[in-house]
């Protein structure tokens, strides 16, 4: 039995999986229509030539641009395509006219590779205070800090790579703008999972996670009135993937984007309730967190290699999850966790099977 009322429709739109896929935060399963759209464009490229096929698909590409921009509260002319979320961030930091030794404030859940990009450019990185033990930004403390100091920009992962905590991005943007500070949002894990219209100056993300588009497609939306206009469209591109992303977004729209958000939050809650206290594994989010990602810290005495071994054990019996190591959130933790991230086609039996295996690994 599916957890979500959308589960059967989501499942029927895809090839039958050979595994229990609980890894949408890494890469969701694309639908048959997405795969067909990608394949059809590749055939057009072979038949007519790549650039001719791209030109003849201009209306499809324009719709994709409009639809993605709308999901993040931007206009089509503010959106550029790149190869991935990280490629989008690199392009932004390359073309933005930042001062030498710029200061950036980040949330505790900041993605490690993003921090590497800041470090390589000599930025001074400061962590915004957290309101709880989960790494959620304390917006009251942030408001107070902004009265006395303003960074060059704030960068926040709407949802991180290491846990399912949803940052209060809209409030962060409101406070930052009141202080004249621009905000950049990494929406890689958020797009398709939660509302990403926050008023941020810059939003970037990827196709392959909760939107269930193809790999190899990312985007960057930069407000026309932000720090500096950024012209960073990637011209040598996976055009078929962009068309596939457009189909994936249209499918989300057909289901109802807000309804998907609600259903995924309910799936996350059910997942946490089912796995709470299983085999000495510790749940790392509040049960009611409004995301579909659940992370489990290992039993006492386990090290990072043990969590990797647990992931490999699950994979060997056909259950796909991620070992989220500490490099994903180095400001927050030194601990590796198991990350469980089901999509709409989650069945109760999937979690029962996972719980049984986890119980056998614990105490």
Label each residue range with its predicted role.
Residues 77-78, 95-116, 124-126, 130-131, ...:
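Conserved PLP-anchoring active-site segment centered on the Schiff-base-forming lysine
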Residues 133-187, 192:
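Active-site phosphate-binding strand-loop segment of PLP-dependent enzymes
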Residues 265, 269, 278-318, 324:
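Conserved PLP-binding catalytic core of the aspartate aminotransferase-like
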Residues 18-65:
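A glycine-/small-polar-enriched, mobile loop at the entrance of the PLP active site in fold-type I
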Residues 45-87, 264:
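Conserved N-terminal alpha-helix of the aminotransferase class I/II PLP-enzyme fold
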